[in-house]
Each structure stands twice: as structure tokens, then as C-alpha cells.
């Protein structure tokens, strides 16, 4: 099962992949053996196919062995070895004759160190992924065993309880238990607890913890590599860290100043708002007073007008009374004048008659 998984998982190049496999079957196809050409050709074809098959098998075995060794190293917390291909390339390039090698050695050292770190980190991550997959497969394989053990323990507990109940039926006194039985029960309970704890630990949270541990291990190794760097790089990183801290402090102070400025502006705006609120209240009170005054003035005007109307009405009534009285007096005077006119007419007529009579008498 583990070999099938390892063949399906994408793996990194191991140390043994660079080695050339020497096949011992080449002696069969060598010339000068005293055989015919036709038979030699058929045998050479067969030998080449056999050699290819053997090489493939050997390569597979070597890959499996290398992967198993890497997994063992991971299990015993060994640091994975660097790739031999990168080391060989580095040695080959360093051995080449280069006139400017002394000047550019420091720059090339940093580049090679970075490449080496990348390769080791990639290999380590791939090996950790393999270990995680293998642990998951082992858990899936042993899951049924854990479940069977748990079921057996629960069944044994139930049977023990039933037996105890049967023995206790019809008896008032409790039965005495020997030391061996008590210890055996404790041992069974401890086993069941251990099995349950193992089952719980093999749940989904277990793999999350594994991933967290892997992440922590990677971070620790990176920190160790950073600490093991030479003093110049350490000083440079410390200087950069100090610069970052200073920049962060400057940014924090700038933000604090901006916050204080904004707070002052907010306080000023609050004061302005309070002043405008006070003015608004004053204007509102004045408007209320003006409304009252206008209402009172209108009421006064109305009252004065009503008084004037009453006075004019009373004067009108008085004048009408006077006019009626004067009209009555006029009528009386007119009647008197008529009476006097009648009397005058009578008097004048009497006088005319007297004159006529006197004239007649005179004649």
C-alpha cells in the first residue's frame, strides 16, 4: 500500500537518481564468442529487452529505498541532505579556471547559498507531504482495528455489568472483589481509555495539528538558518530591522499627530456647532417674542376699531334720535303754519268782505 502511494506521489530528485546502473548482461552481446550472426542478433535483442527491464526494476528499487531512507530521516527528525546534483554543479563551476574568480566569489557564494536553501526547503516540504500521506494511510488502515477494539471493550463492559447485576440480585450485602479482579478491571478501563484517546487523536484535528507542526518546524529551521548566517549578513539584517522599526515608529508618530490634529479639528467644529445652537435658540426666542407682540398689536388694533365702531354706532343712534325729534318738531311747525295760514286766509277774507260792504254802503 505504501509503495503504491509513494509511486503515485510526485517526488523530488534523490541522490541515487544521478548514479548510473551498470548492467552485467553486456557480456552476452560481446563479439568474438564463436556464434552465428542470426542467433547473435536474436540473443542481443532479448538481452537488450532484459537489460531494460532489469534497469527499470533497479531504478524503481533504488527510488523506493531512497524515499524510505528519507522518510526514516524525517521520522528521526534528521535534516534532509542536499541534492548531489547541485553540489556537483557547484564543485564543477568552482573548479573551472576563472580569472575574476576571487572578486566574484562572495557574490557567487550568496547565490549558491540561496539556491541550496531553496532546494533543501523544497525537498523537506515534499518529504513532509509524503509523511503526512503515509500517516493518513496508516490511520485509514488501522481505523477498523481501533473501532473493533472499542466495540469489544464496550461489549466486555456491558457483559461485566450484567454479570454483576445477576450476582447482586436477591442479596443485600455487597460482594467482595479480589485485588486481581480489581486490577484487571482497572487495566481494561485504562486500555479502553487509551484506545478512545488514540481514536480521538486520529480524528480530523490530528491532521490539522500535523500541518501546524510542519509549519512550525519549517519556521524554526528558517530561523536557525538565518541565525547561522555570517556576521555581516546578521548586522545587515539587524540594521534593516532597526530601520524598519524606526520607519514603523515614524509612521506611528505621524499617525498620532494626524489623529491629534483631527481631534482638535473635531473639537473646534463641536464648539462652532454649540455656538450656532446657542444663536439658534436666541433667534427662536426672539421670533417667539415678536409673534407675541404682533398678536398683541393686532388684538389692540382690533379692540380700538371695535371701540370706534361702538362709539360711531352710539353717535349714529343719538343723531337718529335727534333727527326724528327734529322731524317731529318740523311737522308740528308745519301744522302750526298751516293753521296760521288758514286763519290768515279767513282774516283776509273777512276784511275783504267788510271793505266790499263798506264800499256798497258808500255808494
Curated annotation (Swiss-Prot):
<feature type="region of interest" description="Disordered">
    <location>
        <begin position="145"/>
        <end position="171"/>
    </location>
</feature>
<protein>
    <recommendedName>
        <fullName>G kinase-anchoring protein 1</fullName>
    </recommendedName>
</protein>
<feature type="compositionally biased region" description="Polar residues">
    <location>
        <begin position="39"/>
        <end position="48"/>
    </location>
</feature>
<feature type="coiled-coil region">
    <location>
        <begin position="240"/>
        <end position="350"/>
    </location>
</feature>
<keyword id="KW-0175">Coiled coil</keyword>
<keyword id="KW-0597">Phosphoprotein</keyword>
<feature type="modified residue" description="Phosphoserine">
    <location>
        <position position="23"/>
    </location>
</feature>
<dbReference type="InterPro" id="IPR026109">
    <property type="entry name" value="GKAP1"/>
</dbReference>
<feature type="modified residue" description="Phosphoserine">
    <location>
        <position position="25"/>
    </location>
</feature>
<comment type="similarity">
    <text>Belongs to the GKAP1 family.</text>
</comment>
<feature type="modified residue" description="Phosphoserine; by PKG">
    <location>
        <position position="104"/>
    </location>
</feature>
<dbReference type="GO" id="GO:0007165">
    <property type="term" value="P:signal transduction"/>
</dbReference>
<comment type="function">
    <text>Regulates insulin-dependent IRS1 tyrosine phosphorylation in adipocytes by modulating the availability of IRS1 to IR tyrosine kinase. Its association with IRS1 is required for insulin-induced translocation of SLC2A4 to the cell membrane. Involved in TNF-induced impairment of insulin-dependent IRS1 tyrosine phosphorylation.</text>
</comment>
<comment type="subunit">
    <text>Interacts with PRKG1 and IRS1.</text>
</comment>
<feature type="coiled-coil region">
    <location>
        <begin position="126"/>
        <end position="158"/>
    </location>
</feature>
<keyword id="KW-0333">Golgi apparatus</keyword>
<feature type="modified residue" description="Phosphoserine">
    <location>
        <position position="27"/>
    </location>
</feature>
<dbReference type="GO" id="GO:0005794">
    <property type="term" value="C:Golgi apparatus"/>
</dbReference>
<feature type="region of interest" description="Interaction with IRS1">
    <location>
        <begin position="1"/>
        <end position="93"/>
    </location>
</feature>
<feature type="region of interest" description="Disordered">
    <location>
        <begin position="20"/>
        <end position="111"/>
    </location>
</feature>
<dbReference type="GO" id="GO:0042802">
    <property type="term" value="F:identical protein binding"/>
</dbReference>
<dbReference type="GO" id="GO:0046628">
    <property type="term" value="P:positive regulation of insulin receptor signaling pathway"/>
</dbReference>
<feature type="compositionally biased region" description="Basic and acidic residues">
    <location>
        <begin position="102"/>
        <end position="111"/>
    </location>
</feature>
<feature type="coiled-coil region">
    <location>
        <begin position="43"/>
        <end position="75"/>
    </location>
</feature>
Amino acid at each position: 500500500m505504501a509503495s503504491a502511494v509513494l509511486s503515485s506521489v510526485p517526488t523530488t530528485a534523490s541522490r541515487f537518481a544521478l548514479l548510473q546502473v551498470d548492467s552485467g548482461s553486456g557480456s552476452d552481446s560481446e563479439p568474438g564468442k564463436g556464434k552465428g550472426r542470426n542467433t547473435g542478433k536474436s540473443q542481443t535483442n532479448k538481452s537488450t529487452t532484459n537489460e531494460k527491464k532489469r534497469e527499470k526494476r533497479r531504478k524503481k528499487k533504488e527510488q523506493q529505498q531512497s524515499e524510505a531512507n528519507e522518510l526514516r530521516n524525517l521520522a528521526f527528525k534528521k535534516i534532509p541532505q542536499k541534492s548531489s546534483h547541485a553540489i556537483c554543479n557547484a564543485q564543477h563551476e568552482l573548479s573551472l579556471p576563472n580569472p575574476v574568480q576571487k572578486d566574484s566569489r562572495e557574490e557567487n557564494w550568496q547565490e549558491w547559498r540561496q539556491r541550496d536553501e531553496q532546494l533543501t526547503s523544497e525537498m523537506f516540504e515534499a518529504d513532509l507531504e509524503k509523511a503526512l500521506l503515509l500517516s493518513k494511510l496508516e490511520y485509514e488502515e488501522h481505523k477498523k482495528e481501533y473501532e473493533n477494539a472499542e466495540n469489544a471493550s464496550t461489549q466486555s463492559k456491558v457483559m461485566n455489568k450484567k454479570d454483576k447485576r445477576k450476582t447482586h440480585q436477591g442479596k443485600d450485602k455487597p460482594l467482595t472483589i479480589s485485588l486481581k479482579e480489581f486490577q484487571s478491571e482497572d487495566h481494561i478501563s485504562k486500555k479502553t481509555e487509551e484506545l478512545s484517546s488514540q481514536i480521538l487523536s486520529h480524528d480530523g484535528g490530528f491532521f490539522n495539528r500535523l500541518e501546524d507542526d510542519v509549519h512550525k518546524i519549517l519556521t524554526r529551521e528558517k530561523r536557525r538558518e538565518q541565525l547561522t548566517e555570517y556576521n555581516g549578513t546578521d548586522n545587515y539584517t539587524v540594521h534593516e530591522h532597526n530601520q524598519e522599526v524606526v520607519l514603523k515608529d515614524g509612521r506611528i508618530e505621524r499617525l498620532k499627530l494626524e489623529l491629534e490634529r483631527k481631534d482638535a479639528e473635531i473639537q473646534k467644529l463641536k464648539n462652532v456647532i454649540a455656538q450656532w445652537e446657542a444663536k439658534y435658540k436666541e433667534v427662536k426666542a426672539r421670533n417667539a417674542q415678536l409673534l407675541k407682540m404682533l398678536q398683541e398689536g393686532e388684538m389692540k388694533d382690533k379692540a380700538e376699531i371695535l371701540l370706534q365702531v361702538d362709539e360711531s354706532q352710539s353717535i349714529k343712534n343719538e343723531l337718529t334720535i335727534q333727527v326724528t325729534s327734529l322731524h317731529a318738531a318740523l311737522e308740528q311747525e308745519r301744522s302750526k303754519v298751516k293753521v296760521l295760514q288758514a286763519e290768515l286766509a279767513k282774516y283776509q277774507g273777512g276784511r275783504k268782505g267788510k271793505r266790499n260792504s263798506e264800499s256798497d254802503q258808500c255808494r
